[in-house]
């Protein structure tokens, strides 16, 4: 932001920065900056109508107030200058003098008293009213006058030393300088409130006015009588010492200056005592020296005590300000540098005024030119001294006109009399001294009036020189002051005379009193309807936004009311003397029916503090005495009252745990707002009573003590290290006991590497801006509830915006009122709750047995779990309105349902946290704990109850119970025995707040066992006691709540909302009994234990009716294990032919019991693949289920083939004893082979330890237990198959095998299955009524599938790489919720890392990495893959971490979201596209789209998406084509154009891989074959008609834009919006020229970007039979030795360059796969010899540089390794070196064609560009494929017409006009140009000058150049004007700016000619290396 040079610009910048901040706060009207700007514009228009202009000063007759400020701005905006007159303090004589002096000027009167000007004065405009607010519309035609920096802004009339007013001319520049100079501008910022009391005609008043208005502060104008009223809210003050002396002391009790942090004093010298009083109170006091003639600028000094003597020197005025240089000179104006040498003070700089009004002679005498500077001679004397800290400063020695002769001696009244007499009189209580010389000698006046003046004179005789002692001293209470607040010395002598005559009467100062501002409305009592509608509208209105007018037929909740607002409505009606039970509002009656129920009540029934009865007064007195005696407090230094019952309940647990019942909120702010918010919070901390409130349990039965003065200090800690800052923010302790703390943490980035110096807490300077600020408020719950926090946060925001801080109500009075209500209505409330709870059994009241946890020893018992909602708060609110209820009601019902399912009980008691403030009339704004937890009873016994009925019943209960919101817990009949509560949280600041918060976070430590806190967004937190609820139970409760909340919105019956939750709870509790615990056992041991535990249960069942009990299974598998150990002794790995039969399962388990590792082979795979797997894993035997399958075995030596049926035949069964344990925890259980992304199988070892670790986690066992039936559904080679088998058999469940003829048949006979989403998409859950639990594995799950499957079943999303033992996370999927894979298992750690292995921030995407015990040790025979994927955990040394290759992010709730594979990044049309991201966008649409599955593929440069739709939705009215159109429309809105698919294809059944996943390669093949034909139609020789033009043009668009052939182009389609750019439009022009046989250039295409325009353009060209065409002239072709113009330019630059390596071009290519390296070398050598360009050298001859051709071409050089760094710094000798060098490094043995190699091409820009390299590689590919290429005789690029074509006249004319007006030297440095370019991208636009950037021009317009080798790359100037950048309109959209810049670049491109021609045509020297057009090239490089 540029520094403003006029006050109008200064204010405009502030109004733009902070439009909604309060600018002025006064009874005449409080205005924001936007409003102040508007109303001052309106007044400016009025002034312009009176003829006011730059040449006519305006006399402003004014006083402090809003109108004064509006008028000042209006005068300045019309270009006039302001002549302020203080009507409140100036005598009429002086007013008349100024009006006559500034004759014929308009007089603007803002005072209420009319003004009659004297003769000769101008017109009078009275301005005492204004328009503002939402209805105000400023005059749209007003435009502020363009004000120059040197224009006069003010004429300030001062009395001076002569008494005759003189007008000082002060410029805009001078006042801007003051307002922007620290610290004389008091460092005012947003949130600061300036107590504006200086006279409005005082120069310093104008300075401070714009110091505030120019820096977004708030001005609080105040006359003397208003100071005490306005001061408490202000943070800064400008005053004279005399004014300050008359203000109350800042150290008194309840000081009105508790918020004041900075004071600036000037005008006269203050006494040391006065200064000490303020700085000792912690206020920063600045002494400013300056006179009106220097715009109050000169020097400034911060008052400090001498650290040795504790004294204050009041005469020090500071050192030299850079903006206002100051000197001390002798009488000859020679500079005095010596210390203690007195001289005159002179001041220079831009603060020096312009002179005196109409007094040129005086101007010349006082404003002189001296040593090259214009300075002002002040007439003041001073000298250089050293202050207490050794700094060189000026000590003020008085004015030269204050030096008088007394008794023949020169005496300085300031120094010799006043200062000396003050020192003498300190012991007499003297506070100030003023002296004046009279004809009889020196007289003095001292204060106060009780000073013994006679004794003072006598003592002075002992110390002072006799000629310095006044002959007469008078004592008064107040000194006479001028209107500017200075002491009037010329009245002192008269004052002495009056004292002597005894006629002096001191003026009495009456205290101002506040007038009554709130007037009660008078309402008729005819049914009270009008009152009810008016009050309800006010209650429903938002701040600054009125609610619509309510009608009698409206009902409260239907129009948006809530339960909290209902109680507020009752409270407000009570203030009007009206009473209505809240339950009547909850009945959803129209207002017309509610009004008759309102009754009147006497106002006297309201209990107030002033009505204390005797008993209360006695109680308070006793508490006061006890506090003094027991706590040592001083009487009258505090207020005290009793604690409420709730406060006592909250306080008692904290005695044992200082962090119990503590609330903490953290709010972070970024740099623009950090300073404001820091000051706002610190001001609130000092002034808010709650922060000086103490809870004492030692006094009475517990007391609340409110101290009069703050006794707690906030903490400020600064950090320059980001990590330490974040660590400190996280580590703020919550153990504050019964008190509170405020921590202010700041983060400062330091660019110099030096540490940031922390600022102490009492330092108030804001000169250093903070990069980030975090405020942490930690407070005990007894001091503050949620609504109190909201009140505090609102106050902080108001303070930050400049508004005054509203006073909080008395918490002691509120407590007394609450206790009185509770006591007076005790019997009533007890009777009510006794009846309400009568049907509830005791076990539902007291906490029963809840899920116990094994709490870790020493860990906190309080835990917090965060959940994202399934239904947004907006949806809940809308649903509540639809049902005429409150949002809280919906949440209460959902929570009750969740608890009912968890407890398996139909009766539930929920604690509802409600505010009891509505019962505390006149105490609604008290800060404290004013809420109650009331019991809500829910009964879910009626299976037919509807959701609507339940909502109505709950609303009635809320209304009835809410009547007793004031009740104590014991009065509710259950005390604090409720174990669960729900609390609606108030919103915290966010990015939309004013000022905005960067982030917020809250934490609580409740004493309740289970608390649900619903945030304003709908997300919720669960606080639970870990000794009663474990983590898994808390997660289930949260999931129950989410499901119930969603179901309430979509189900009809209540029981249907609870079915799935009850199922989940039953499964969880049943499976918990049989869940494995961590142990040192192996799988064999666990398996044998289960077989012995459940011998008669069915273990395995097949499709043919075959069944085996666990006992039978045990024996048969023992036989197989025995056979394996005897047949293949010491075998390690056994392969299994996995045909899905019982024999296969027997073989698998037998292998495990034999202590071997098994590997499943897929019968569907080829024999060769099975052989490959057996070889890789080293299998020693193959186990066939049946001997008849022998032909399926690979023919391998040393592979023993065994058959299970043969093992179990005959006498073998007698060997059924238990086998010894051969395996260990670390030995492998199974080897899983996956194809991966390469197609080659990779072997993954899963050990016993890692597998059993996975099985011990919650949910990984598929909730298996005896009686559960689990399907074996997955492919045997899929890792999840192992989870199916062992989840069943390790937990006593039944494993149901597949039917080979019907893969879905076994799902009819199971209740649990693991299924891929692909399979889920094609089956109907209704066909499988027994299926209760589904695990989705292997693929992403769509929201549509979630919605369909979760209506009656549990759906879990399972994720885990096989490398991490199958599962690493699982998540119950709930409709409406985000689809994630949940939180990591307890046995793994999941990190999200970037490419450099650094952690990503929450929410950011990165690679999913998994660490922990489940990570594999190694791959089988894949060391490179292992080295790449299996790393050491950086944070846990010695443990492994696996890089999954999956893209993911972790949300705020800790759940992992997947975004596809990282390796699915493709490049289409030059843009990077994440296929996984496209798929995610497709499936994350609304469920109504019905997308069940999708796959994105890239084929031939096109982005294609395949989708399938839900079967149930295919019969809707929309066809698949219409669904695809809707989907495509949404994707165009949501995705970048490059990521929008060119085509979406519907498919019923996706092709599958062997593991059941979608086969994308098969889709690519399918699409290629489907789209293999072209739709291009032949065009005959017949006349071209419009349809054929359209067809041809459409075909060319599709080719250039790479659109699919079927794309139907619309007439409105825009070439650029479909992906076109500058290069593609050139290509289109070339293709259209060939297609239509007419020359079509970019110049014709640019004005016609739409399809319709181009049709018309082509048609018009074709219809013209003859037309004049300007053909360019041609030069003779270039000779072989001649250089092109570009080659010459590059050669010249190469000769003079300091870094010639900058001209190097290097390309490194990694070659992998089946490439014949020798053949590749031969092809490269062929191409190097074809075009002589590669044999070129450039030599300097007599005619300049020329080309010579070498005899031989360069060849490929084979090297062992290549040093890239060295190549980059290779210095080509253009005359002797080959200018292209090709290197090849093999990475295997020569002749090994399957290995990989590195190809490096190094060349010089003199002969090549990027196009050359691309063509070189393309030619190499052609030669490699076997094609023969013919060698050329001369370089092909020399034949291009580009070198011989002379630009046409129109082309030359274009460039002359395009660059017209551009100065030859821009006057910008490289750095400034870089800033300008950066400004373009950062939207910080500059209108200072034109920008011309150099852009690359490929120089290859035709196919001849496009296919040539050689250097064509040229430069093209792109002019970007201020208009392009939007400087003419600050609201210009970014897209419009980009379009303008693009248009300019395309214009240049369409007229491109040789850059050398452009330079020549502009008249610059030919061949100049440093052309003046631009010094910055802008490139876009695609890597």
From Swiss-Prot:
GO terms for biological process: amino acid activation for nonribosomal peptide biosynthetic process; secondary metabolite biosynthetic process. Residues 1089-1469 are annotated as: Adenylation 2. Residues 1652-1976 are annotated as: Condensation 2. Disulfide bonds: none annotated. Disruption phenotype: Completely abolishes the 11'-deoxyverticillin A production and conidiation. This is Nonribosomal peptide synthetase verP. Induction: Expression is regulated by the cluster-specific regulator verZ. SUPFAM superfamilies: Acetyl-CoA synthetase-like (SSF56801), ACP-like (SSF47336), CoA-dependent acyltransferases (SSF52777). Pathway: Mycotoxin biosynthesis. GO terms for molecular function: ligase activity; phosphopantetheine binding. It comes from the Eukaryota. NRP synthetases are composed of discrete domains (adenylation (A), thiolation (T) or peptidyl carrier protein (PCP) and condensation (C) domains) which when grouped together are referred to as a single module. Each module is responsible for the recognition (via the A domain) and incorporation of a single amino acid into the growing peptide product. Thus, an NRP synthetase is generally composed of one or more modules and can terminate in a thioesterase domain (TE) that releases the newly synthesized peptide from the enzyme.
